[in-house]
Amino acid sequence: MFIWEKDSINKEQEDAILEDNSVLLIACPGSGKTRTLTFKIAYELSRLKSDKEFVIAITYTNRASDEIKERVELLGVDTSQLWIGTIHSFCMEWILKPYHLYSERLKNGFKVINSFDSEKILTELCKPYKEEKITYYDCGILAKTDNFYLTCLDTKKHNSLQNILGEYFAILEKNRQIDFEQILFYAYEILKSKPVVANILSNLSLISFIFSS
């Protein structure tokens, strides 16, 4: 069991570390939030009773992932059952790769298109819309649980953008590709349509954290 020095954290930090239910940490920079999360991860790792259990730490950036993992290792805790990364990486590694066969769109295989190739396709599709001054930068989308939504604030462009993005998604589907935003969308779709997958993840005792600066 991971044990820390008595004076290394305060009572509130200790309560957060020992809490078995969900914890929301709100703290200003320099208040010890990172230390608390690091100790929490180390504590949960030391409590695992099976090699089928994992502690999952989800961060906003890869840099934060590296920092947290390094801090946990410096505490002398075995990190072989720690997975840490961004939400997109988590969805790829734990949902899409092992369970993509449950998705009608992905069941025949897929690859993730990089941002350069995505921009190249969208730039080409925008060319017929020069009079409307539509460019690649207008083609931003936000994936939500039910669909994709345009981020362009100029609503006059929305109809044309819907057409452009319709063509874009058709090209990706034809080539068995998905882009960055679709990683989250299809991961959620699998979890929603196949409760057995969500149940499997739950039974692995996955514990997740959102960490920012």
Where are these regions (language model features)?
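Accessory N-terminal region flanking or inserted into the helicase ATPase core
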Residues: 1-26, 31, 35-36, 54-56, ...
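Walker A/P-loop NTP-binding motif
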Residues: 35-50, 67, 71
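Conserved P-loop NTPase-based nucleic-acid remodeling module centered on helicase motor cores
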Residues: 54, 66-139
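Short helix-terminating capping/connector loops at secondary-structure junctions
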Residues: 49-53, 78-80, 200-202
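Short, well-ordered alpha-helical packing segments
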Residues: 41-42, 69-73, 88, 184, ...
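Alpha-helix C-cap/termination motif
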Residues: 19, 47-48, 75
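Catalytic P-loop NTPase motifs of RecA-like helicase/translocase cores
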Residues: 44, 90-91, 208-213
